[in-house]
Amino acid sequence: MDSFEDKLQQLREAFKEGRTRSAEFRAAQLQGLSHFLRDNKQQLQEALAQDLHKSAFEAEVSEIAISQAEVDLALRNLRSWMKDEKVSKNLATQLDSAFIRKEPFGLVLIIVPWNYPINLTLVPLVGAIAAGNCVVLKPSEISKATEKILAEVLPRYLDQSCFTVVLGGRQETGQLLEHKFDYIFFTGNAYVGKIVMAAAAKHLTPITLELGGKNPCYVDDNCDPQIVANRVAWFRYFNAGQTCVAPDYILCSQEMQERLVPALQNAITRFYGDNPQTSPNLGRIINQKHFKRLQGLLGCGRVAIGGQSDEGERYIAPTVLVDVQETEPVMQEEIFGPILPLVTVRSLDEAIEFMNRREKPLALYAFSKRSQVIKQVLARTSSGGFCGNDGFMHMTLSSLPFGGVGTSGMGRYHGKFSFDTFSNQRACLLRSPGMEKINDLRYPPYSSRNLRVLLVAMEERCCSCTLL
C-alpha cells in the first residue's frame, strides 16, 4: 500500500483550489517560518549540537541567521517578485500587453541532506513558498535530532493542507520519487543525484540538483602564509569539514607548502587549542559510516598535522596531508571531513591544468596579492562559484546565485534566484480582438511586399512608440 498517495493528493487539490496563490497567504507562511526560527532557536541549536556537535556560533552563522535572512528578504520583496515583468515589444505588438508572469509550478518535493539540516531545508523552502507552491519536505534521517524538530514542530507554523514533512530512509525516498511532482529540489551527493534525476526523467519533472565535488584552492607564492592559513583553516574545518563548498585540496609550490604547513598548525592551535578534541568549537563526524570512510583516508600521503581519531566520539582531528599523489583515494573522492591535502605544483599554469582535468567543482578558490593571478584563475577555469582571497564568503550574499555546474549540480537558488527557480516563467501576450486590418499582412495570398513590411514590424523595438 502506498503511504504517500492520500497526502500528495490532498496537496494537489489544495494547489488546484488556488490556496497558495495570493500574496497574503505566501506572506503568512513566510511569517510562520520566521516564528519557527525565533521560537525554537535554542531547541534547534541543541539538535544541531546533538547531531553534529555543532557549536552555537556555527549554528547561528550557518543555519539559523542565514535562514532568517532569506525569510526577511522574501517578505520585503514578495510583491515585487510576484509582479508581471513587462518586456520589450516589436512594431506589430506595440498596442498589446507583453509580459512574463511568475506562476508556481504546483507540488514541489525538497530532499534535504544532513550536514546543514536547517539551512538546506528552510532556504529552498522559502523560495518554494514565496513562489506559491505546495511543498513536500523530506529531511535527512541521518541528522535524527534535527529531523525530529522538522517533522514535529515546523508543521505547526505552516498551513498543513499545503505543506507536509515525510520521514524515512532510502526505501521511503525511493517510493516518494515514484510519484509525479511538478518540481524536485535535491541537495546531496552525485550518486544519489543521478537516482533522483532518473526518477524525475520518468515524469519529465524539472529539477535542481545541488551536489558537490572536489573544490580546489590555489595559493600563490606571494601570499602571507598566516593570513591564508587562518582563512583556509576556518572554512576547511568549519562543521568538521562537512561542507559542500569547503576546499578539498590546496595547490601550491613546494616553497609555499613549507611556509604554509607551520602557519596552518598555528591557526589550528589558535582556533581549537593544543588538544582539538576538547574544543567546544570543533564538530564531529555525523555517523560511524562516514567516520570509518574518513579514517581510511588518513593513510594517504603523509600526515603533517593532526591525524588523530576517536571512534567513540566520531572525532577526527583537523588534519593536513602532504606528499599526496593524485591517484590516492583522498584525491579521487570528495573528502567531506576535516582533512586537507596539499598538492605541490611548479606554476600557475600547472595548477590550472590540474584543476581543469577534473570535473567542474561546486566552488573554486584562489589566493594571491596580484589581482591578475586571481583573474587568470577565474578566466581559465569553471565552477559553480568562485572566491578570491577567502573561503565561502560568497555564500553569504543572497545577491549571488548558488549552484553547481556539470557533476557538481544544476540550477541556482538563494534570494530572488530561489523564487525564480520555483516559478514557471510564463510568456504572455494579450492582443486586441479588433484592428484586424493590420493582420492582413500575414495572411495568404502572400506577397513580397507584405513580407518586407511584416519583417520590419516583427523587429523588436525598445521604444514605447505606439504609432503603426
Curated annotation (Swiss-Prot):
Positions of the pro-segment in this chain: 466-468
Residue positions, PTM N-acetylmethionine: 1
Active-site residues (renumbered): 210, 244
Gene Ontology biological-process annotations: aldehyde catabolic process; aldehyde metabolic process; cellular response to oxidative stress; ethanol catabolic process; lipid metabolic process; response to oxidative stress
Pathway named in the protein's UniProt entry: Alcohol metabolism; ethanol degradation; acetate from ethanol: step 2/2
Organism: Mus musculus (Mouse)
Keyword Hydrolase attributed: no
Name of the protein this chain belongs to: Aldehyde dehydrogenase family 3 member B1
Modified residues (Cysteine methyl ester): 465
Major localisation: membrane
